[in-house]
Regions:
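Hydrophobic pocket/interface hotspot
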Residues: 16, 28, 36, 85, ...
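Short, well-ordered alpha-helical segments enriched in acidic and aromatic residues
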Residues: 23-39
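N-terminal amphipathic/basic helix or basic patch
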Residues: 4-15, 23-27
């Protein structure tokens, strides 16, 4: 039985969020596209790359951000090899763009702010 695209996208997003909270670099590695652009909605957008996200994850930077552990994922659209999703957690709200790769769905763009 194969997963639907929406199920696979939710799994990718959970790898990203739960990997962050748990300090699990393997899950984060799997979830993020090599060309990730992650930006925060703030006066200066800034930019986090995949390499920096893996570094921060390995340092356990997300462990204090778990809150109540809630991670609500909504897949808004899937069109061929691209998709968009949003995530609400106790700490973050994010909009994500994903791309289908030979290895599965990966997050290419993320725009976030604190909840």
């Amino acid at each position: 039985m194969t997963k639907t695209d929406a199920e696979a996208i939710v799994d990718t997003v959970l790898d990203y969020f739960e990997g962050w909270f748990d300090g699990d670099t393997a899950r984060m590695e799997r979830a993020l596209h090599p060309e990730l652009a992650k930006r925060r909605a703030a006066e200066e957008l800034g930019l986090l790359t995949k390499a920096r996200m893996l570094e921060l994850t390995g340092q356990g930077a997300g462990a204090e951000d778990r809150g109540d552990g809630r991670v609500d994922v909504t897949v808004h659209d899937v069109y061929g090899d691209i998709a968009t999703a949003s995530v609400d957690s106790a700490t973050y709200h994010e909009y994500l763009h994903l791309v289908r790769t030979p290895g599965g769905w990966q997050i290419a763009n993320a725009l976030w702010q604190f909840s």
